[in-house]
Amino acid sequence: MSSNGSRQPNRLSGGLVDRRRPMDFTFNGNRFQGYQGDTVASALVANGVKLVGRSFKYHRPRGILTAGSEEPNALLTIGRDAYAEPNTRATVAELYEGLTAKSQNHRGPLGFDVMAANDFLSPFLSAGFYYKTFMWPRAFWEKVYEPLIRSSAGLGALSGQPDPSKYDKGFLHCDVLVIGAGPAGLMAAKTAALSGARVILADEDFRLGGRLNSETYEIDGKPGQTWAQEIVHELSEMDNVRVMPRTTVYGAYDHGIYGALERVGDHLPPNGDKPRQVLWRIYSKRAILCAGAIERPIAFGDNDRPGIMLASAVRSYVNRWGAAPGKRVAIFTTNDDGWRTAADLAARGIEIAAVIDPRKGDAPQKPHGAQVFMGDAVAGTYGRKGITQISLASGRDIPVDCLAVSGGWSPNLQLTCHQRGRPAWREDIAAFVPDQGIPPGMSVAGAANGGLSLQSALTEGLNKANTALQDLGFKTSPQAAPKSDDESTAVTPFFYVKESTSRAWVDQQNDVTVKDVKLAHQEGFRSVEHLKRYTTLGMATDQGKTANVVGLAIMAEQRGISIPEAGTTIFRPPYTPVPIGALAGRARGKDFRPYRLTPSHAWAEEQGATFVEVGMWMRAQYFPKPGDKSWRETVDREVSTTRNSVGICDVTTLGKIDIQGRDAAEFLNRVYINGFAKLAVGKTRYGMMLREDGIAMDDGTTARLGETHYVMTTTTANAGPVFRHLEFCRQCLWPDLDVHLISTTDGWAQFAVAGPNSRKLLQKVVDPETDLSNEGFPFMACSEITVCGGTPGRLFRISFSGELAYEIAVPARYGDALIRALMKAGEEFGVTAYGTEALGVMRIEKGHAAGAELPGTTTAQDLGMGGMVSKKKDCIGNTLSERPELNREDGLRLVGFRPVDRGQQLKAGWHFLPKGAPADMTHDEGWMTSVAFSPSLGHSIGLGFIKRGGERMGEIVRAVSPATNVDIEVEIVSPHFIDPEGERLRV
């Protein structure tokens, strides 16, 4: 073994790193050096670092196990301060100049973790201990046990600072998506690209080629690494191909949509100006999964010591990165592929201490100078912070500083399960392969499909691409797959060493042992799903990529059945962890929940309005004027001015839905409780819609502007939910109806003009072609109009205040100009602008229901609108609204309340009790929903629900708030405090 500098004692010559670009980095405060093209893991291996972390439960020493994204042990925090990223796999994190990394999940130094005391408590922390321990004494649950468990939970820690990195999102479309750029993926991508199809080739690695980068294969007489880079270069030069390295396709969703995470900046020093990662939504017509396979470990005594690695990972570090995991290496393999590790190490001058193969018979090859033990197994290991010796089942001890383990290969089939697909067991390769339920449009090639030889991968990639092209109508390729080394893939199922006397680890991150699996069987948790949750097998950040099959095999043996009979769990997205920042993209802070501003917002700011958040809207709450001593005085003035003269309020936030089509009237008839089939053109009608369970969903008005044209308004809070509900009805319930919907909430500015002088004010703004007289434009009329000399608009004569009122609408871009024109026209009448507070006061005075009266539990009967329910037609929720429990004679009814002592103030949330009854649930008769001080009446008023409310007008009951020690008498009255006959709004 030759070293390439004293700073990297385990660095070999060769490899695919750029030695012209050395890079300094730190690990746990110690300075090291690597090269461009290294991962953090390969650089640590080159520097002789074996101990990199601690396990989750027992805090046992952990080293690097793999060389890819399946890594369960080497989880580090990369970066510092706000840029720190916990739980980063060292095996995929690219090295860059100045990188800082630190180990995690330990207290005290990594080499002396005080939490390692948990290992001595392992008899009390076995599988399912959390169901059986900490049960007594009860007082300790929250005071002792929970704080103890929570302080011990987790792996890496967040910085506690806002993430300064930028993330982005994007959409891509292609004919063929190739997932994985190994030999099968490169062959599939090239075949598809030559046909003229639009191709996306995505791979999680920064160097495309898959296992070819780590092996000594030849393809068409040239090194596999060279062949791969030639194909990548050829694809990169083609206009119809997008090559995406550093891109993990993490999820397969409906309709050929795939989620992908591209790490565009993780290999560079932190830079807050450029995106760190991009989340892609890829729309593909066909997808070919060429994700390769993952090597499995073998469970044997103390198989978790640092320095024990997968055989393929050892080859990767030696061949790709020129880093030696050890100086004296033993290989423990159950298959022919593992023997190739011995050959590659020997070729690089690394001493082979022994090759151990549990299979009987002759050795597949004779590594130079190595001892061979056929029919034997590694039963145990020694070493504190790294392996120093192995013990064979035959009793022989062999000193080593690295052990390469190969228990066979498991195809990377996770994406095939994301739509409930279930794999099948193949006995010849002792692995699960894709079978039923593969996402539509997906095919699988290469090792991911069980084709473990290089030649089969190349051939399958070509064939699956041709099949996809044929399905899409493209010309298929007549070329044959290139010729390659044809290696043996013979394997004998062998999952754990029964002769081991010490703990044998199955899931190294979550500290699940063979004994834990057997204990789960003993205690009745034998289903694969129960096994997973009882032992936490496969529930770590790696989702059991290296552990699941071993655990399932042990459970199958315990049950006395075969592995396919035992079954397997399936996978769900994401394939590897996706940062929450990437899912959010640019939607952070106010970009996540931006304020929606009304068209009159700038004008309202000029008037000194106080604003309030109403959902995502910023609405003017009230408009204080010089001399106003309090907000109440301002609101009282706005209400009084409106009722005595005229007031204007921006009601743009009300949901507006444009409904058109030949069957629009029938559609409305089916969603509203009252009839809309005979609504005349130029008329507006109040309506209420129910949920399917008969509960009131929303109320509002719908105006008929033309024979097939309607405009619906909804409450501000329910604008989105109602639109989604209507779209569901249109698309799923009645797709045969000719009706089309579009939300126009943001497209129209709308203002309520209310008060006795509202008609006079509008006559100065609305163009004279529109007759605004009571006869020409009566209550509930609507019309398309023009204003201010030809600007198109709409006018509705509806009232939320109980006064003569209109709502005038113009395209949103004219909203600011319209509010200024309205206020200018109203100066001679002493017009006032009013906000949401005055709006709320007037609606309570008039008895209109709003959000507080529509909490999702009330019915039309409760709201006093039972008479609106049409008996001549059906509608959504009609049948269930007739349930006896919803129509009880003693049910809740909406009524008004006023204090017997007019000087007392009411508050929402108070409960009603009969006079003389104790304040308990048994005697509770209802609650107060909305309250306001009425300047028109001079005292506090409220709306609320009380049992048999309609029959109890004038009755005195108690309004009680035990939380604030309030107990006063209130009188039940009509909810219509102002103009109960509705005369004002019809003048």
Positions of predicted regions on the chain:
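Conserved, structured C-terminal
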Residues: 597-601, 605-606, 619, 706-708, ...
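Short beta-strand segments
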Residues: 30-32, 280-282, 396-398, 698, ...
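Residues forming the flavin
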Residues: 2-597, 747
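Residues forming anionic-ligand binding surfaces in small-molecule and nucleic-acid pockets
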Residues: 293, 438, 525, 636-652, ...
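Acidic, proline/glycine-enriched N-terminal capping motif
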Residues: 550, 557-690, 695
